[in-house]
Amino acid sequence: KLNKPLYTVACHDDLTAADLVGRHLIGPNGTYWQDGPLTRAVREGGICYLDEIVEARKDTTVVLHPLADDRRILPLERTGELLQAAPGFMLVVSYNPGYQNLLKGMKASTRQRFVALRFSYPEPMLEQQIVMQESQIDAELAAKLVDLAGALRRLESDLDEVASTRLLIYAGRMISSGMPPLQVCRCCLAEPLSDDLLTVEALMEVARLYFAE
């Protein structure tokens, strides 16, 4: 709808500033400069989306600072350029706050340069519609999966992560393919949430309240 080029970067520990900005490469005619996704978005007035930004090192994300404040510039030290962001340029980052710890989290100086939106799980009726549409299952089964997810999410204090809408969609697809519902609950909802056998069995006890043997 925005009709803008979108550059998506999956952040990780080994991501460097050069991966975002660009680097010199060797070609048949010598060295040449190759723009990174951030630089291309800046030049074109596109959208640069950094997924799971807290996975990137803090010394990498500081390259965003002059772009994310009122300067709207990107210095390219290796070429000597000082790029002014083209009209329409957008910088979008995302992360799951539950993953943060003492070692992983956004620098305060980085976070304060962004407008923040907090997203929670969809309302049950909306989530049911999403699961129905994405996994092609009926309303009754989708409602059971969403209710089960709600029960599991209430156990979030005992789990590193709780059942996501994505997992419900996977479960719906596997049930519609013919796999027994309880086996699907184990494979798609219990096992992915914990490596501890006792915890998995406790989650399965909850699942048995919604799906018969």
How would you describe each model-predicted region?
Residues 1-213:
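C-terminal regulatory/interaction module of P-loop NTP-utilizing enzymes
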